């Protein structure tokens, strides 16, 4: 059982399983999706070509989100370590708690146990992390979580199958979205800074309609 297979036919293809061996059962989500809307921003194109130009513009937007949720815990998904470091240095807010490869688990535990409204900032908390209830009342997705084409294996697979790259990006995006909504009556608002995200969501064939309808 999984909440993030998206397209079971393509999923089986990625696993090398014949489609005839798959029987898909779909169930409606028990979550109230009105409790986890997606809000987007205009004017911040964080593509490889324009991120240096537009990243400085995002700082005030992130500060405004942090101020709006000044008494709540949240998380900023930066996708890359470079973006994490940039935001820590330029947002310059004592609530931010980051990590490196060596202390990821330790910092996550520190974040969970703290009574302060800390904000976890990370490139790698988009899956396998459970932040129910007051542990995450808001989250910021800084940029589209495209797989890193600097990785040779990813580049080879993307060149061989463009759909695979779109699928992996959609999968990462929907998994990231799910970090703050962990049980039926939970609630969490998601902010997408990268202005390319709404178009990506609207045009990606792997993302379900219920997800596309979350943008407010």
Feature map (PLM): residue ranges:
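Phosphate- and divalent-cation-binding pockets in alpha/beta enzyme and binding domains
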Residues: 9-10, 83-87, 127-130, 201
């Amino acid at each position: 059982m999984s909440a993030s297979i998206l397209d079971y036919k393509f999923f089986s293809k990625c696993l090398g399983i014949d489609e005839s061996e798959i029987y898909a059962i779909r169930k409606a989500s028990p979550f109230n999706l009105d409790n986890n809307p997606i809000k987007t921003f205009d004017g911040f194109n964080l593509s490889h070509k324009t991120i240096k130009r537009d990243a400085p513009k995002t700082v005030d937007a992130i500060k405004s989100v942090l101020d709006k949720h000044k008494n709540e815990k949240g998380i900023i998904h930066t996708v890359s370590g470079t973006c994490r470091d940039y935001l820590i240095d330029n947002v310059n807010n004592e609530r931010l708690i980051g990590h490196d490869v060596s202390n990821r688990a330790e910092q996550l535990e520190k974040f969970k146990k703290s009574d302060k409204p800390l904000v976890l900032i990370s490139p790698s908390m988009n899956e396998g992390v459970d932040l129910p209830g007051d542990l995450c009342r808001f989250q910021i997705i800084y940029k589209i979580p495209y797989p890193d084409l600097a990785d040779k294996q990813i580049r080879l697979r993307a060149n061989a199958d463009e759909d695979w790259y779109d699928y992996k990006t959609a999968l990462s995006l929907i998994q990231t979205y799910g970090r703050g909504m962990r049980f039926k009556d939970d609630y969490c608002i998601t902010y997408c800074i990268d202005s390319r995200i709404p178009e990506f969501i609207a045009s990606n064939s792997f993302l379900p309609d219920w997800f596309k309808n979350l943008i407010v």
